[in-house]
A protein has these predicted regions:
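Active-site nucleophile/metal-coordination loop of metallo-enzymes that catalyze phosphate/sulfate
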Residues: 1-38, 45-133
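Structural beta-sheet core signal
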Residues: 40-41, 145
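Feature for exported/extracytoplasmic and membrane-associated proteins, marking the mature portion
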Residues: 127-146
Length: 146
């Protein structure tokens, strides 16, 4: 059985989207107050259950863990889908990146979304939505990803 999202639950798609809204002084799904800047740190593969299981090794992070601070990764829980959700503010069915390996029908091959990029692939044809960074820049706000 596939996992079902919680009704009105928060997901990775809400994180940067809420940061941008807070910087613009707008309401947002995370309930962030108006801010001037935001820094988001994502530790790939570090879900709430893994953090609970290793709480003794990550006391600062695990100490901040509450039921309200846990958000859904989305589905599927691959890095490609999750990072695209984080950076576009959209769920995988909307942004189009749903797994690691996908068919590149234009070149009749299977490519890896994380490491298989070459000159024959155009990112704009795979990621169907603009990123939060692109929208921030279009609004005249500085934005960067490291």
């Amino acid at each position: 059985m596939l996992p079902a999202p919680k009704p009105d639950g928060l997901s990775l798609a809400d994180v940067l989207e809420s940061c941008l809204s807070a910087i613009q002084g707008q309401g947002n799904r995370l309930g962030l107050p108006p801010i001037e800047r935001a820094v988001v740190l994502l530790v790939d593969g570090l879900g709430a259950e893994a953090l609970k299981a290793t709480a003794g090794h990550a006391r600062t992070l695990s100490g901040a863990l509450t039921t309200k601070s846990v958000i859904e990764a989305g589905f599927p829980t691959t890095t490609a889908a999750a990072l695209a959700s984080l950076t576009t503010g959209q769920l995988p069915g909307q942004h189009g990146l749903v797994g690691y390996s996908v068919l590149d029908s234009a070149h009749d091959r299977v490519v890896n979304q994380l490491s298989g990029w070459d000159d024959n692939l155009d990112p704009a044809t795979w990621q169907l939505q603009p990123t939060v960074f692109e929208r921030a820049s279009a609004a005249g706000l500085g934005a960067a990803a490291v």
